[in-house]
Amino acid sequence: MHLWYWVIGLTAFLFVLPWLPPKRRGALAGETSITFHPDRKTVHARFGETLLDAGLRQAIDLPYECRNGGCGVCKCTVLQGQVDPGLYQPSALSAAELAQGKVLLCCATALADVEIEYRAGQALATIQEYTARVARLERLAPDVMRVLLALPEGQGISFKAGQYINIILADGERRAFSFANAPHEPEFVELQIRLMPGGRFTTYVFEQMKEGDSLRFEGPIGDFTLRESSRPIVFVAGATGFAPVKSMVEDAFQRGLKREIYLYWGVRTLRDLYLPGLPEAWAREHPNFHFIPVLSEPTPADAWNGRTGLVHEAILEDFPELKEHEIYACGSVRMVEAIFPFLKKHGAEDGACFSDAFSVSARSLAFQPRQS
């Protein structure tokens, strides 16, 4: 009797299987196939595995950086089949691009067998994985922590000023942080980490991390680096966007760069200007360096006599014409996206504007209340 129940159940399952939604079929099948173009290589993805993870696991050199839906480097096109685009930052993939069949390799999962086209030749050839020890923790402000990471003896990491690393969490998720030290200071990897409300990793840094803890990371990543040019440089830093700028400025001094350098550091209040003495010292020691801090919401207690308002407004007051300058902006996605249209109206050229936008993990953002 039990055998008949089993036969009837199996027959019913086989009968309804073709009408199951692709996502359910994929879940039951356990694996889907992904064919990557232009190399026409086919790999198998486990249920719930992103296109990127499946490809990397099977030796496909795919382009990526942040691995959390924030940068857009791994953008690809779905040629055939269905995918779940997953959670990502709107700044990395627009609604129009999604409608055109674009998805992010690091977020999308296959719902059935799919064919994907990506831009070959963009894979990160030098990226490596490291295990480091937390050598020092120093609170620079109530919400900014300096973290110094030490690599095992005899091991180092070669990078360019302006690049960053991905901290690898226990579940494989990544969190991106810029090198704050210059390449000629290889003893420690310096990070400047800002506490994000509801941020899983940053909360861990501020509440649980201890000196001696181990951290896995991968790097170096990114191309937010100084270009070879004779143009004056304008750095625009928002909050901890100062970290990669610090690396780039100190590297420029080390290399004897004589170009004029202007640093506009935009924060809300005086306490957010967490290392003011450092750029002030640079200005005293290097005649070609100029430091302009800008507070958008100074408090009466700040007794602030310096520049106020929005950071791009301060730049345009000083430089009504920016055609001859290179602009390097680093900070939140909102800040970076807001300033460039204004600067370009005053002559800043597309080929001379570079940015590194800090994005909250798309997965973390999805579970946080929308800010009004």
Please provide the spans of the model-predicted regions.
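Short, Lys/Arg- and Gly-enriched loop/turn segments at beta-strand edges
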Residues: 173-180, 222-229, 365
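Residue-level marker of beta-strand positions
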Residues: 50, 57, 113-115, 164, ...
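Short, surface-exposed secondary-structure boundary micro-motifs
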Residues: 79-82, 121, 170, 220
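Short, conserved phosphate/pyrophosphate- and ester-handling motifs at nucleotide-, phospho-/glycolipid
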Residues: 162, 241, 332
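Ferredoxin-reductase
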Residues: 126-214, 232, 267-269, 294-298
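Reductase modules of NAD(P)H-dependent flavoproteins
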Residues: 1-108, 260, 267-372
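Fe-S ferredoxin-like electron-transfer domains
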Residues: 93, 100-150
